[in-house]
Amino acid sequence: MSKEIPTPYMWSYQPQTGHAAGASQDYSTQMNWFSAGPSMISQVYGIRDLRNKVLITQAEITKTPRTIMDPPIWPAAMLVQEAAPPKTVTLPRNHTLEQAMTNSGAQLAGGRQLCPSQIGIKSPVLAGTGIQLSEDIPSASWIRPDGIFQLGGGSRSSFSPTQAFLTLQQASSTPRAGGVGTYQFVREFVPEVYLNPFSGPPDTFPDQFIPNYDIVTNSVDGYD
């Protein structure tokens, strides 16, 4: 029964080329037969059989349909195209904006009424030329590109040249083709459940399980 429930083949990854570098059986899943009774052996067989069924189902879900397990060149349509990292550039300072927003912020921070309030009536009058929070906002030409502006007043501007950044998202003009990345490799090369590995002739054994198999020449190095 142990031959009917094979140990799966674990794929190795070659990061330089983006291809599989052979596969070998994971013998760490084998049990210690010297301390196992018939009942334990039966339970282990059941667990191994369930594991193989899970791996087969996972492969059907995550693998990209293809005729060759590891093609020499993966076309762009079969590859996960990773987004390019964003590029950050420094924006020039806008001294006019800083002065205008600082002046407005000084009024928002507080102030004294120009005229005494009428007796018994509290009038929420704001003095100065500051903006009202419930009314208009500063002109779009006064707002910094990075969205930073000052609400609290002061004699010194709180803006710093290091705060003015613009982030640009780059995009590749040509889709990538060739080998798979590490993220896609885990999805495409699920541990292989090779049923009855010793029941057929040697030439039926998958060549891509062999580490020194050359996918370009479709041959095994050192063998005719």
Curated annotation (Swiss-Prot):
Pfam families: Adeno_PVIII
Family, similarity comment: Belongs to the adenoviridae hexon-linking protein family.
Native organism: Canine adenovirus serotype 2 (strain Toronto A 26-61)
Post-translational modification: Cleaved by the viral protease during virion maturation. May cause the middle segment to be shed from the capsid.
InterPro entries registered for this protein in UniProt: Adeno_PVIII (IPR000646)
Induction: Expressed in the late phase of the viral replicative cycle.
Propeptide position ranges: 112-154
Assembly and oligomerization: Interacts with the peripentonal hexons as well as the hexons in the facets. Part of a complex composed of the core-capsid bridging protein, the endosome lysis protein VI and the hexon-linking protein VIII; these interactions bridge the virus core to the capsid.
A single MF term (Gene Ontology): hexon binding
Keyword terms, alphabetized: Capsid protein, Host nucleus, Late protein, Phosphoprotein, Virion
Other remarks in the entry: All late proteins expressed from the major late promoter are produced by alternative splicing and alternative polyadenylation of the same gene giving rise to non-overlapping ORFs. A leader sequence is present in the N-terminus of all these mRNAs and is recognized by the viral shutoff protein to provide expression although conventional translation via ribosome scanning from the cap has been shut off in the host cell.
Top-level taxon: Viruses
Protein name per Swiss-Prot or TrEMBL: Pre-hexon-linking protein VIII
This protein's GO CC annotations: host cell nucleus; viral capsid
Gene of this entry: L4
Site positions per UniProt: Cleavage: G111, R112, G154, S155
Modification Phosphothreonine, positions: T64
